[in-house]
């Protein structure tokens, strides 16, 4: 784990993905504020992301962490990897993720790696195409993880057995 990880007493793993300084130009000059992008997960399939904005960096990070805890989703994992290969996009960012065999590790870059680590995925091959803007990459990764379903839930929706859909 890197130095921007934190373990809370609730059992969540928190990661800071990005801190950005933004400026608003007013009559008297510029007003600088900070935005933070964070991801939070329990390492067992629950993961959330949030954005916060404030005049000070710690306050922006705190707001982002709270937003991430409110925005949690449950991901159906297949042990320590994904159920199947998937593509997802948000804005100009496109992501591709596929399951990997045991011992592969997380082969993913930047913002995608942070999301997959806190979600509890330990073996995955992932690639980001197009824009690598961390905000859009995190959104695209979340869209893909949210859309992923286990074979059991797909079979239940179709009224079939798991063996019949494979």
Swiss-Prot record:
One of its GO terms (biological process) is translation. Keywords: Ribonucleoprotein, Ribosomal protein, RNA-binding, rRNA-binding. One of its GO terms (molecular function) is structural constituent of ribosome. Residues 12-75 form the S5 DRBM domain. The keyword DNA damage does not apply. SUPFAM superfamilies: dsRNA-binding domain-like, Ribosomal protein S5 domain 2-like. PROSITE patterns: RIBOSOMAL_S5, S5_DSRBD. The keyword Nucleotide-binding does not apply. InterPro entries: Ribosomal_Su5_D2-typ_SF (IPR020568), Ribosomal_uS5 (IPR000851), Ribosomal_uS5_bac-type (IPR005712), Ribosomal_uS5_C (IPR005324), Ribosomal_uS5_N (IPR013810), Ribosomal_uS5_N_CS (IPR018192), Ribsml_uS5_D2-typ_fold_subgr (IPR014721). It comes from the Bacteria. HAMAP family: Ribosomal_uS5_B. Part of the 30S ribosomal subunit. Contacts proteins S4 and S8. With S4 and S12 plays an important role in translational accuracy. Located at the back of the 30S subunit body where it stabilizes the conformation of the head with respect to the body. Belongs to the universal ribosomal protein uS5 family. The N-terminal domain interacts with the head of the 30S subunit; the C-terminal domain interacts with the body and contacts protein S4. The interaction surface between S4 and S5 is involved in control of translational fidelity. PANTHER family: S5 DRBM DOMAIN-CONTAINING PROTEIN. This is Small ribosomal subunit protein uS5. It comes from Pseudomonas fluorescens (strain Pf0-1).
């Amino acid at each position: 784990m890197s130095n921007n990880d934190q373990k809370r007493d609730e059992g969540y793993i928190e990661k800071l993905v990005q801190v950005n300084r933004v400026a608003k130009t007013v009559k008297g000059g510029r007003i600088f504020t900070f935005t933070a992008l964070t991801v939070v997960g329990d390492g067992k399939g629950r993961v959330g992301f949030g954005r916060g904005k404030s005049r000070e960096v710690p306050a922006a990070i705190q707001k982002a962490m709270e937003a991430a805890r409110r925005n949690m989703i449950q991901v159906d994992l297949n042990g320590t990897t994904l159920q199947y290969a998937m593509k997802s996009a948000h804005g100009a960012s496109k992501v591709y993720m596929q399951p990997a065999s045991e011992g592969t590790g997380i082969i993913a870059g930047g913002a995608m790696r942070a999301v997959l680590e806190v979600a509890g995925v330990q073996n995955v091959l992932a690639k980001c195409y197009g824009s690598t803007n961390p905000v859009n990459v995190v959104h695209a990764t979340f869209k893909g993880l949210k859309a992923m379903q286990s074979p059991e839930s797909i079979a239940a929706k179709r009224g079939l057995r798991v063996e019949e859909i494979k």
